[in-house]
């Protein structure tokens, strides 16, 4: 999980999701997981 100031979709399978007020990226590729800190 990468924690970044600006999250973005890396591939076309990445999905932006808002959970508990944080923006997350979930993807089938675990390297693409991100969270906005």
Curated annotation (Swiss-Prot):
Pfam name, any one: Ribosomal_L36
GO biological process: translation
Major location category of this protein: plastid
Database matches in InterPro entries: Ribosomal_bL36 (IPR000473), Ribosomal_bL36_sp (IPR035977)
Gene Ontology terms for molecular function: structural constituent of ribosome
Record bears the keyword Ion transport: no
Record's GO cellular component terms: plastid; ribonucleoprotein complex; ribosome
Compartment annotation: Plastid
Coiled-coil annotated residue ranges, if any: none
Keywords recorded for this protein, A-Z: Plastid, Ribonucleoprotein, Ribosomal protein
Family matches, as PROSITE patterns: RIBOSOMAL_L36 (PS00828)
Superkingdom: Eukaryota
Record bears the keyword Acetylation: no
HAMAP family per record: Ribosomal_bL36
Family membership: Belongs to the bacterial ribosomal protein bL36 family.
Protein name: Large ribosomal subunit protein bL36c
Organism, scientific name: Cuscuta reflexa (Southern Asian dodder)
Primary gene name: rpl36
